[in-house]
């Protein structure tokens, strides 16, 4: 029997001035960026939580607490590489990933392929195993009011051997 594990992740960060907007490791031209202790890449953060959750390893706050100065301004793709290593060490590999980014602005479709390629490179998987969609919240809630950007992720892992 094939062993499978599934994990879900979610993250949201406030939009502020004087910060870059980074999603999936892609810096996107926009007048606002995401506020956070690290680079505030909500897509990569949600994905890390999904991967950790699939193996009951807690969440990114456990591994990269905002109270720790080492993670100030950290590149989330480098943190993702560390999370990926935890999965590999336990004998699991990624079967596929599915992600949704919720943002009113900017339009993200032109950047999705680059996000997939960045994540795939770090995770050493084919970009076709990573789904990324962008949607709006139809002007409802904090993302709809353009106060922040959120991301949801699902990770399906398969046991090696």
Swiss-Prot record:
Q: Name the SUPFAM superfamilies for this protein.
A: IpsF-like
Instruction: State the free-text cofactor note.
Output: Binds 1 divalent metal cation per subunit.
Co-factor requirement: a divalent metal cation
Pfam families the record matches: YgbB
Q: Taxonomically, which superkingdom?
A: Bacteria
UniProt keyword annotation of Zinc present: no
Q: Tell me the residue numbers annotated for binding 4-CDP-2-C-methyl-D-erythritol 2-phosphate.
A: 11-13, 37-38, 59-61, 135-138, 145
Keywords annotated in UniProt: Isoprene biosynthesis, Lyase, Metal-binding
Catalytic reactions on record: 4-CDP-2-C-methyl-D-erythritol 2-phosphate = 2-C-methyl-D-erythritol 2,4-cyclic diphosphate + CMP
Kindly list the positions annotated as binding a divalent metal cation.
11, 13, 45
Would I find Metal-binding among this entry's keywords? yes
Q: Which GO terms describe its molecular function?
A: 2-C-methyl-D-erythritol 2,4-cyclodiphosphate synthase activity; metal ion binding
Pathway annotation from the record: Isoprenoid biosynthesis; isopentenyl diphosphate biosynthesis via DXP pathway; isopentenyl diphosphate from 1-deoxy-D-xylulose 5-phosphate: step 4/6
Gene Ontology annotations of biological process type: isopentenyl diphosphate biosynthetic process, methylerythritol 4-phosphate pathway; terpenoid biosynthetic process
Q: Which NCBIfam families match?
A: ispF
Q: Quaternary arrangement and interactors, per the entry?
A: Homotrimer.
Output the HAMAP family linked to this UniProt entry: IspF
Name the chain's protein: 2-C-methyl-D-erythritol 2,4-cyclodiphosphate synthase
Q: Which organism is it from?
A: Synechocystis sp. (strain ATCC 27184 / PCC 6803 / Kazusa)
